[in-house]
Amino acid sequence: MKSSLRLNTGIILQIIGPVMDISFPSGKMPNIYNSLLIEGKTESGDRLKVVCEVQQLLGDNVVRAIAMSATDGLQRGIKVIDTGAPLSVPVGVTTLGRIFNVLGESVDKMGLIDYSITLPIHRAAPSFVELDTQLSIFETGIKVVDLLAPYRRGGKIGLFGGAGVGKTVLIMELINNIAKAHGGVSVFGGVGERTREGNDLYQEMKESGVINDRNFKESKVALIYGQMNEPPGARMRVGLTALTMAEYFRDVNKQDVLLFIDNIFRFVQAGSEVSALLGRMPSAVGYQPTLATEMGGLQERITSTKVGSITSIQAVYVPADDLTDPAPATTFAHLDATTVLSRNLASKGIYPAVDPLDSTSTMLQPWIVGEEHYNTAQSVKKTLQRYKELQDIIAILGLDELSEEDRLVVSRARKVERFLSQPFFVAEVFTGSPGKYVTLAETIEGFKAILSGDLDEVPEQAFYLVGNIEEVISKAIELQ
């Protein structure tokens, strides 16, 4: 095996940043997406190991490849080995609780990884006959999400929110709940975000029990990071590495998987960085002409099959808050739901700070969720919308100037707003309140009771940071 690999070696002709041209012997050209390996020593004696991926065949036995790590120390004339296959990464239980880079190498220095089962990162999306065509809700146990912007099993959700409004805590709670309620696992792909954030997430996951560093197999998540200091090749492919690990849990272990991508915009950005170096003509706003194809290739692999599902939650950065920018606009075409986090709610102490009026879902249709769920959700939105409209009047004239009917709407809306808050399992260490998983049936029952007027006499403090409606009543008795 090794002798045949040794025969298929090429040499570097030119290096332009992360992109290099490599010449191979006639008749021994590597395929597109093949992984190429450069090993040796720099002039200063440092060990050199760079993995590249073939992107183009230029003719005259020359290929153009993108490096997955820094190209410092490389020179023209250095030997390059064709591995004969695409980049492959470890999959399965061995990945749980560990941190990987784009190449599937562990970076947490926490012991060896079992490389006996690996899969290539470039794979075809499931065929039509394998897909699950049933529209079903993915219950998260989080009231505001399940009622007003429900997630689709095997769907894609966009997560919008600035810094410090609770994105990380919401992500950790979802990871915790899918493990407990669905027996599923999660895969977190950190694409082009800050190293500090990745480290904070890892430490918080250890504190909250999502990662068990004494027995990794009991962990609920695998982490794959390609941070913003990495070359664009790594940031462009780290999403595929995370997706490949998630696909194994879905297809082989037959599990429900949550795939987090933070941030999907950085995946597009990395592609645009290398696009010009690959000689492609830029399209709108300087993005790569293959933007829709690259996005589609990633998103189409995220789906439900007859044996399991991958539900993906993707943080979406919107450059300059311009929703018509080609990167977010292309992402929106693939999303089934959006969860928008509001700084205004976070400042009131209402967590999770999910904006009930801005968050949307294509699943909120009466023929999918049922008439009762649909009508309750619409009534909640209507009440909150009316409260929002009345806030200017309240600020200027006060509550006393409102009609009896509007005062009742405001009272119920404030109770609804507080009842949309919920104590999280992963936040127990900060809040001191035990976490609550609220089923969809309990959620609908609770909001119907508030809107029907059954709880008009209950003080609004009783609705804050509780689970189901029974807890509201018992808390009200304690407050008396």
Swiss-Prot record:
InterPro entries: AAA+_ATPase, ATP-synt_VA_C, ATP_synth_F1_bsu, ATPase_a/bsu_AS, ATPase_alpha/beta_chains, ATPase_F1/V1/A1_a/bsu_N, ATPase_F1/V1/A1_a/bsu_N_sf, ATPase_F1/V1/A1_a/bsu_nucl-bd
Main location: plastid
Enzyme class: translocase
GO cellular component, one term: chloroplast thylakoid membrane
Keyword DNA repair in annotation: no
Membrane topology summary: Peripheral membrane protein
Assigned EC number: 7.1.2.2
MF-aspect GO terms: ATP binding; ATP hydrolysis activity; proton-transporting ATP synthase activity, rotational mechanism
Keywords: ATP synthesis, ATP-binding, CF(1), Chloroplast, Hydrogen ion transport, Ion transport, Membrane, Nucleotide-binding, Plastid, Thylakoid, Translocase, Transport
GO BP, one annotated term: proton motive force-driven mitochondrial ATP synthesis
Catalytic activity entry: ATP + H2O + 4 H(+)(in) = ADP + phosphate + 5 H(+)(out)
Annotated localization: Plastid, Chloroplast thylakoid membrane
Stored PROSITE patterns: ATPASE_ALPHA_BETA
Matching NCBIfam families: atpD (TIGR01039)
Subunit field text: F-type ATPases have 2 components, CF(1) - the catalytic core - and CF(0) - the membrane proton channel. CF(1) has five subunits: alpha(3), beta(3), gamma(1), delta(1), epsilon(1). CF(0) has four main subunits: a(1), b(1), b'(1) and c(9-12).
Function: Produces ATP from ADP in the presence of a proton gradient across the membrane. The catalytic sites are hosted primarily by the beta subunits.
Record-stated family: Belongs to the ATPase alpha/beta chains family.
Protein name per the record: ATP synthase subunit beta, chloroplastic
Species this protein is from: Euglena gracilis
Lineage: Eukaryota, Discoba, Euglenozoa, Euglenida, Spirocuta
